[in-house]
Amino acid sequence: MNRRRRSRSTDQASSPSKRRKIVACQRCHDHKIKCSGDQPCAKCRQVGCADKCQYTPRDRQVKVSESYLNLLESENQRLKEQSASSANATEADHDAEPEPVPPADAPDESNTSVRNPLIGDRAWFHRYDPSTPPLFIGEAACTAFATRFRRFLTGNNALPHIPRTQYVKEEQIAEANATNVQWPSFHQARLLVKIAIRQVGSIYHLVLRKSTLEKLEEIYRTGDFDCTVNQCKFFALFAFGEAYSMRAEPLSGSRVPGTSYFARALSLGQVLPERTSITHLETLLLLSLFSYYLNRRHSALVLIGTALRLGLSIGLNHNIPESQLIDPVERQHRIRIWWTIYIFDRMWGSKMGHPSQIPDDDIHLDMPSNISPAQLHEEQFTDTEYLTANVKLARIVGETIAKLYSRRKYSETFLQRVQKLLKALKSWVETLPEHLRLNDDDPGTYMKHISSLHLSFNQCVILTTRPTLLHLLMKLNETNSPSTNHESISQPVLTLGEACIHAARHSHTLILTKWINGSLPVFGYFHAHYLFSSALVLAMSSFLPIGSPSDLGAFESGLEVLRSMSENGNLAASEFYHNLEQVKQCLDLRKSKEPKSTSNADQQPSTTASGSGPTIPSTFPPTVSTVPPATTVSDPPLLTTAEADLISNNPGYGHAQGSNPTFTPGNLTFPTTAGGITTAMAFLEPTMQDFLAQSDFDLGLLHPVDTFMNDENLYTCHDL
């Protein structure tokens, strides 16, 4: 017996592992029977209860160090405090509802590795009419940025957003359609179509130039005026022709010429075709673009969205086999129509902060190309390289909205995303063909499509960098003490601010040069928009050490040009002028609260406004700006004395279609020299090159002043 016990103990000691104790399933445990420990166990399979064989989960005990427990407790406390502060930082115009504290295991969405740092926890809505749904305000919209700036100037984070009311209402469109809109005479129709092709067809590919004129002649020759498809297309073209050749259209009840033709074309295209045609897509493009002339931005977005979906239904985003479409003109037209839809989708969305409607990964189409013979190409199409550059720029614009103004989750920091976007913009401007570059020696010779391309580029730079510029202004205001100096602001923030100011000055110069030369369209949307965007940045620049006090004069010039455009019937200019006028009132109010100072007049202006207004410390050391400041129109490189006298003695000089501004040359601002500012200049500065050359690791180690990019969103952390 003892030998047997010793043998058993010896076997157990020599066993490599102790036998695991079998845990019974719930059924075997209740019946107090032996369980095999399988899943399902043998007893449950035997009685047909295999699906009910369940085991009670075991709560094992593990040993951890005390330091690890302390680390978990401190991390838990940090997340609770961060969640509470994030919940309290909400928009002032939102309903004051307490936000629920997220559970401890919820992802930390205030970190840029999870969510965009530029926007708040909730979307921005503004109710201005109780009978309609609240308006969504996209942070990428320039009017939204103007509201943020006005809140900063006044120190009032409850300052309401200014809604857009200057647009052609649905009742006015219905009234315009009710008029007896007829085909014009052949000669007038041909003239209107040629004007439309010349003015908008040089910027976007909308129609085949020669084929469109030939089709117009065929319609008048055969008398076939009843085709709805043709009537929609040509009435839309007539609308553009009138917008660029007339000053007003009183019979339509609208301030914008061409509204009657637009209303008629829109009504005829209400029924969407089940089998769409390229002609119908052309019409949707024309109607979408003209909607901007009526300042109907939402309608424009809906129309281009319809065109995109119809284009997908016929596979425009794919290459069609040559065997199924032999005609090279039709093949190239198909390609270019899609890319125009693509450009509109990206550009229209960027104006309001809406996402792109199709990702780039779903597009499998060749870029535009030339066809042979060259004469045939020139008769039907515009410059291929210009359209290609426009497509590439639109792609960057779409990425800017997605990476900086959306709630998508990214592992990269804010500065890393900005750096990648600026690298793409730098590559775009460096690879731009020579004939698409601006002629710095003679700014008056800029062709319309080239200047439009560079204005779009500058706006993309502004979109990418202006949140940082506003952040810089806020940081100078937060700590009103001599300790706030240029060393407390990281160099990347200063560099991005300078790039934003440079782009704004360049756009301002291009548009005012067009205004003086009389080539600025009265009823266009985009020049008014770009002027408004640049004026906001220049107003901010006048307060910053990297800017110049003279930029405030450029702001005043932009305000006067928008006022004159508004008086001539430009609805978009009316909206933007009203916004800038409110900004000017905030600037004047801020200036009136400044104490009288006997310091050097050349010192950077500072503000010590009383009350709740912001205060920028006057002790901020001046930083050498690499962007040439604006100067008055009296500088000889741009205007001679005779030209200045001509403008002074003739108020209508240089203004399209007989506009009558009241401002004098002394209020106008221009660059020091005609070639003083170039599109690529901001990317040539050493500080910008250093920023673009930094690694992701370096940009991930943010300067203390930039922790807002990791911890709090840009606007709500400043109570705007």
Predicted regions and their residues:
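Intrinsic, low-complexity transcriptional activation domains
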Residues: 1-203, 224-232, 238, 252, ...
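Fungal C-terminal regulatory tails
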Residues: 86, 311, 353-355, 364, ...
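Fungal transcription factor middle regulatory core
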Residues: 116-163, 195-198, 214-221, 243, ...
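Intrinsically disordered, low-complexity transcriptional activation domains
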Residues: 134, 410, 613-720
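C-terminal transcriptional activation/regulatory domains of eukaryotic transcription factors
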Residues: 158-279, 284-296, 323-329, 374-382, ...
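Residue register of alpha-helical TPR repeats
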Residues: 236, 282, 340, 388, ...
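"A position-specific structural signal for the A-helix of alpha-solenoid helical repeats
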Residues: 240, 286, 340, 344, ...
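Classical protein tyrosine phosphatase
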Residues: 294-310
